[in-house]
Amino acid sequence: MIGPVVTGNPVMSPVMLIGQAPGVKEGPAGKPFAWTAGKTMFGWFAGIGLDEEQFRSRVYMAAVCRCFPGKAAGGGDRVPSPDEVKACSKHMHAELQILKPRLVIPVGKLAISQLYPTVDKLAEVIGEKRRGELAGQSFDVIALPHPSGASTWHRTEPGKTLLARALAMIGAHDAWRSLLASDPSLDTSDSLRA
């Protein structure tokens, strides 16, 4: 793992997003999802009421691993090893115990596997609301695919439809709605019903 440690803003929130690990650009930027995958992801969340700035100030952003894992031999970012995941898990577990979130949004297969280790395919969990339990906490889980430009899953079927379904579920969730309630101009309930 290559420092620095990258974390989101220390915001108390009923919603917790869990990513995989920072990319090479996130360390210098000092924040998670600071590059192209983030632009895609924040576009998704803007469609259900929170732009990037609002999201970063209202949603707690965690990660399975806190440092850039380095590049993979074949290109792209290396997926953290099981030992690296285990070494970092205490941080995410502590965050869950402090926040006690009502909604957890794991982004990408590694984050999803922390809650559902037997899930093999994204289509098994994207577009569904499930109950999750980790670190002695119980919460709703609505998973999203990783927004990486290298992945076509969220741009082709069935991923495109399942992503839209997942985002609608997030937008309708009471924990998400509570984030919008602090600013009535952010309420998208009419557009979600349309």
Task: Describe the role of every protein-language-model region.
Residues 182-192:
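Short, basic, low-complexity termini and linkers enriched in Ser/Thr/Gly/Pro
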Residues 1, 192-194:
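Accessible peptide chain termini
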